[in-house]
């Protein structure tokens, strides 16, 4: 397996894409520490994966919680090779005109504190261990870090900020730590919204994303969370990704190559090539 003996710390790793990443990295024989706010889901991870996983309950907005996750990871597994800042919330595409004036400041702070400051805290907390291991950071971005309409102005601005973090930290931490980013598209998950906008109990799985993306993406469907994990394994693999730092992999299902009048230009290929589906 590609990551035998490697140690990975993932924030927001107890559900959604984060959970898929934990499963994939364990399958690649890595040891994984997870910082998440849900003690119940962390306990389930440890039950499912045994000594391969360490769960740490905490809030990514707290530098002390992030430092505790880093120190407990090193105490149990001896090092940190890969850090994946992944915890986040979505603003459910709340447009500027729909943002209540009385909630705007709180909503901005909540989205940016989790989606941006939480990432900075993670790197700050893990930096000594990452430099010591000559490790790497893989930021979870989003297609909203590259295109409009993947969220409202708060989410989109936050994800564009993460793109800037990848580039700046790739410079600042070279040559000892590689820093890259993966931009997944929509995933049917438990991703929540800002509590400051009354969306803390709302999950993205309640949105008919599969139907929406089927007609928009050239690949013709919404990918599963597991299908995005290979990009993270690639960046974490020392041999395969040694030259990669400051790289941004926008996994957009072909959104960037949509035609003006249709999502995919090859819809008639099976018929024209006489291939039975």
Curated annotation (Swiss-Prot):
Molecular function in Gene Ontology: cis-2,3-dihydrobiphenyl-2,3-diol dehydrogenase activity; oxidoreductase activity, acting on NAD(P)H, oxygen as acceptor
Pathway as given in its UniProt record: Xenobiotic degradation; biphenyl degradation; 2-hydroxy-2,4-pentadienoate and benzoate from biphenyl: step 2/4
Annotated catalytic residues: 155 (proton acceptor)
Keywords for the protein's UniProt record, in alphabetical order: Aromatic hydrocarbons catabolism, NAD, Oxidoreductase
Binding positions for NAD(+) per the UniProt entry: 9-33
NCBIfam families the record matches: BphB_TodD, PRK06200.1
Protein name: Cis-2,3-dihydrobiphenyl-2,3-diol dehydrogenase
Species this protein is from: Pseudomonas putida (Arthrobacter siderocapsulatus)
Underlying gene: bphB
């Amino acid at each position: 397996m590609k990551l035998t003996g490697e140690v990975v710390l993932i924030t927001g790793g107890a559900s959604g894409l984060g959970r898929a990443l934990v499963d994939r990295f364990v399958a690649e024989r890595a040891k994984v520490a997870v910082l998440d706010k849900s003690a119940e889901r962390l306990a389930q991870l440890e039950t499912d994966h045994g000594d391969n996983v360490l769960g740490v309950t905490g809030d990514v907005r707290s530098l002390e919680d992030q430092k505790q996750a880093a120190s407990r990871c090193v105490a149990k597994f001896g090092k940190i090779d890969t850090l994946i800042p992944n915890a986040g919330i979505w603003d459910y595409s709340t447009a500027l005109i729909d943002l209540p004036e009385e909630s705007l400041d709180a909503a901005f702070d909540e989205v940016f504190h989790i989606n941006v400051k939480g990432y900075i805290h993670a790197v700050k907390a893990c930096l000594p261990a990452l430099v010591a291991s000559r490790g790497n950071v893989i930021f979870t971005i989003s297609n909203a870090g590259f295109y409009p309409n993947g969220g409202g102005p708060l989410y989109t601005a936050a994800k564009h900020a993460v793109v800037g973090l990848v580039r700046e930290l790739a410079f600042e931490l070279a040559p000892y730590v590689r820093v890259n980013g993966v931009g997944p598209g929509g995933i049917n998950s438990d991703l929540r919204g800002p509590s400051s906008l009354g969306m803390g109990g709302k999950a993205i799985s309640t949105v008919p994303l599969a139907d929406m993306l089927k007609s928009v993406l050239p690949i013709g469907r919404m990918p599963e969370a597991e299908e995005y994990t290979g990009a993270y394994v690639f960046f974490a693999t020392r041999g395969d990704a040694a030259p990669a730092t400051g790289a941004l992999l926008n996994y957009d299902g072909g959104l960037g190559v949509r035609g003006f009048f249709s999502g995919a230009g090859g819809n008639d290929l099976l018929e024209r090539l006489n291939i039975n589906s």
